[in-house]
Design a protein with these regions (language model features):
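Alpha-helical solenoid repeat scaffolds of the TPR/TPR-like class and their adjacent stem/linker regions
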Residues: 1-379, 384-440
Length: 440
């Protein structure tokens, strides 16, 4: 393979990566590296594919090797920083992003990525500064806008935060659904609107506190939610028409229906949660009374305090490491007198002795099963998960163990969204130290 052929192959690899055809691109990359093992561009391609495949440790090695060949390449320093970011090595990531900015002070991606790492470290003021520097370089840099939103929202600057948050709709983390020729809802009254879920299950529950506000000012409200929430939302919002089809194609109920406007559920707060006093914090979900009776009968037969517990949450991108409790961590709970612990975790691989498990409820495809269980507990304690959102939304006493690095929604001294949720911060302590100091 001569140099001209190499350039042609690299163009083909680049085109395949743009089309996200990584499995086709990788054999070509291997072929190039066999003949040109020091080619920085091809090493970068390989690193990018590993990064997109959620294998940041492999990506890190390729980017580092590429930088040995091209130490003045600003994009490579940013890529190395991104790999460190995905590995939760945020201080190292920021160092590499700043190196990239040093090479080119007008490079928006360097500041934008730095702001993302600062957000993950809950350093809101610094994240805001970095995001604004990125936007000075490129006012349309979407990730910087999202990081700026997180910073504002963490500090309770609701109007500014929701304005930036709204710009992220349609991006990687907030999928936008379009049903016809309807417009995005601007909060106008007396309209027929469709509210759709756009993130995870916990996010749908979290933002659902705004649904009653939307119903109150609209002519008619349709809700297109996750199928697991359909029954729970139908009961909780009887004035709305609810369908659990947001992840489906060719949806029949849409035939013959015209909407005036659509709104992602995460877009509702910009209309209804604009200042501290606009958060009612009241319970807004209603569990199935018949399924509740089953759990009530069981728990009454125990004649003990029944506490729900969550010991794991999130993914490697959402601080799963910080949102994890071991048997040793929860040992103080296991020693509580006249108390039974019930797991609210799902897809449990290793059970903890002394904890009760009901997978037919927690792993159910119908979240009504989980909600009914939660509704009859005396309280819930654990790391932040969908179950904790559900618990607080049902009005159950909920203690949320907030890791040192946490999302913007847990940055307030108290949780404005749920008056039934108490935030307990880890700070620099171990989880066992935190739990040992809880007074039940």
């Amino acid at each position: 393979m001569n140099k001209d052929e190499l350039k042609k192959v690299q163009l083909a690899i680049h085109d395949l990566i743009q089309k996200e055809q990584y499995d086709v691109a990788m054999p070509l990359i291997n072929e190039v590296l066999t003949e040109y093992p020091d080619d920085a561009a091809t090493l970068n391609f390989a690193g990018y594919i590993w990064l997109m495949g959620d294998k940041p440790a492999f990506a890190y090695q390729y980017f580092r090797r590429a930088l040995q060949e091209q130490p003045g390449n600003k994009a490579l320093w940013t890529s190395l920083g991104r790999a460190c970011h995905e590995l939760d090595r945020f201080d190292e990531a920021i160092k590499y992003f700043l190196k990239s900015a040093e090479l080119d002070p007008s490079y928006a991606m360097a500041y934008s990525n730095a702001s993302a790492s600062l957000v993950q470290m809950s350093r809101w003021e610094d994240a805001e500064k970095a995001a604004k520097m990125a936007l000075e370089c490129d006012p349309k840099e979407l990730h910087a806008q999202l990081n700026l939103a997180h910073s504002y929202l963490a500090k309770g600057q609701w109007v500014e935060g929701w304005k930036e948050w709204d710009k992220s709709l349609g991006g990687k983390f907030r999928k936008e659904l379009v049903y016809g020729d309807e417009v995005r809802w601007n909060g106008d009254k007396d309209k027929t609107i469709v509210i759709y879920g756009e993130q995870g299950l916990g996010d749908e529950i979290f933002y659902a506190s705004c649904i009653p506000d939307a119903i109150a000012i609209s002519k008619k409200v349709y809700i297109d939610c996750d199928e697991r929430l359909e029954g729970l939302f139908k009961r909780s919002f009887p004035e709305a028409i609810v369908h659990g089809t947001r992840k489906q194609d060719n949806v029949r109920w849409l035939d013959g229906i015209t909407f005036d406007a659509r709104c992602g559920i995460g877009g509702l707060p910009q209309f209804f949660r604009t200042h501290s006093k606009s958060f009612p914090g009241t319970a807004f979900l209603k569990a199935d009374p018949q399924r509740r009776l089953m759990w009530r009968a069981l728990f009454d037969s125990w004649n003990k305090t029944v506490i729900g517990i969550t010991t794991k949450g999130g993914t490697f991108r959402t601080n799963a490491k910080g949102r994890s409790l071991t048997k040793d961590d929860i040992a103080p709970l296991l020693k509580l007198k006249d108390t039974i612990l019930v797991s609210l975790d799902y897809d449990v691989e290793e059970r903890i002795d002394g904890v009760c498990y009901f997978p037919w409820a927690t792993d159910s495809k119908d979240y009504d099963d989980t909600a009914a269980l939660i509704a009859e507990l005396d309280m819930v304690v654990g790391v932040n998960t969908t179950a904790l959102h559900c618990s607080a939304a049902l009005g159950v006493k909920t203690w949320c163990l907030v890791p040192k690095w946490h999302q913007w929604r847990y940055a307030q001294p108290s949780m404005p969204w749920y008056r039934h949720m108490r935030l307990i911060y880890q700070d620099d302590r171990t989880w066992k130290e935190v739990i040992e100091n809880l007074n039940f």
